[in-house]
A protein has these predicted regions:
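Conserved segment of winged-helix/HTH DNA-binding domains
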Residues: 72-103
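Generic C-terminal helix-cap and adjacent flexible tail
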Residues: 3, 103-107
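N-terminal helix-turn-helix DNA-binding core of bacterial DNA-binding proteins
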Residues: 2-44, 64-82
Length: 107
């Protein structure tokens, strides 16, 4: 079973899906129709992408009459933030070790 950050990376790897998610982050809640109007794909494609985003926990839907509104769930990015922080710490440590080695080589 894939871990949380693998699911998020896989979900956000698609440029169209990532653009939809970014738009929801920047502009707030949107209907499928509003998202489709600015997307370069059909309404069924937008709906499919929203389904994948929802399954990954990145968006939430809210039904109002015949319309479905979607909003970004930024808390779902926590596993990516944690992973990125771990990797940043790992590489910073490696760069510090390399810097120490280069200083010793110059002496």
């Amino acid at each position: 079973m894939p871990n949380a950050h693998d699911v998020l990376f896989r979900t956000l790897a698609d440029p169209t899906r990532r653009a939809i998610f970014e738009r929801l982050c920047r502009e707030g809640e949107q209907t499928v129709g509003a998202l489709t109007a600015r997307a370069k794909v059909s309404q069924p494609a937008v709906s499919k992408h929203l389904g994948v985003l929802k399954q990954a926990g990145l968006v939430r839907d809210r039904h109002e009459g015949r319309q479905t509104h979607y909003s970004a769930q930024l808390r779902a990015l926590a596993p990516l933030i944690d992973w990125t922080s771990q990797m940043a710490g790992f590489w910073q440590s490696r760069f510090d070790q390399l810097e120490d080695l280069l200083k010793r080589m110059d002496q």
